[in-house]
Design a protein with these regions (language model features):
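Short helix-coil boundary/hinge micro-motifs
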Residues: 1-166, 173
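BZIP DNA-binding basic region
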Residues: 143-207
Length: 207
């Protein structure tokens, strides 16, 4: 079970030494939870995938990698962040009724190569063609491929694109997938941002 969401304290020392205490799981699907590892996009741009160890732990908690946490070298951490921002660029373009950036789509498509075993045609010593599978990518790459596949599934479907949202709070930048029957959900969490907004409206009426 994922830990609850945490509000970021105003006095939070940045950059973080580790982002693990500040992950939240309100996106409704792995691709959007991944985008949300960059917190407060409107304000402080808080990076919560600070180290390779952070990313390895996050992939396990997100359910796209099995424990133990996969090893993530620095260059792969950088590539993972690039994938995250590509997904977000496509998401925000859709929400703003703009064409999705070609570069973002190409990058997501690149990661799909790691999402599942790929067929490989080889020759035996006797020259007979044999169909097999290519060597699997490392665990962290496979997990990032799974995130890319989730993003591609969401972005590539008109029905699913219509369910992508950004929290209506002025201070929250969480992206989420609206699974409500009416499709009118406004908040990443009613118990968090929704209640805060409700309390503000109440205070305004009392003033």
């Amino acid at each position: 079970m994922h830990p609850p969401a945490y509000d970021l304290p105003e006095e939070l020392a940045l950059p973080l030494a580790s982002g693990a205490p500040y992950w939240y799981w309100l996106g409704g699907r792995p691709a959007l939870d991944f985008v949300n590892t960059r917190r407060e996009r409107w304000r402080r741009q808080v990076e919560t995938l600070v180290t390779g160890a952070d990313l390895g732990r996050w992939l396990v908690q997100a359910g796209v990698a099995s424990p133990p946490a996969p090893r993530v070298p620095r260059d792969l951490l950088d590539e993972a962040r690039e994938l995250r921002e590509a997904i977000d660029a496509a998401v925000t373009a859709i929400l703003e009724d703009r064409p999705a950036p070609r570069g973002a789509v190409v990058l997501i498509d690149h990661w799909l190569d790691h999402a599942a075993p790929r067929p490989h045609l080889a020759l035996t010593d006797g020259g007979v063609p044999v169909l097999g599978e290519r060597a699997p990518a490392a665990a962290a790459q496979r997990a990032l491929g799974a995130i890319a596949l989730d993003a591609a599934t969401m972005l590539g479907s008109e029905r699913e694109r219509a369910r992508i949202r950004i929290c209506a709070s002025d201070t929250c930048s969480a992206r989420f997938y609206d699974r409500s029957p009416a499709g009118r959900r406004r908040w990443c969490s009613m118990t968090a941002c929704g209640n805060v907004a409700k309390a503000r409206r109440h205070r305004a009426r009392q003033a």
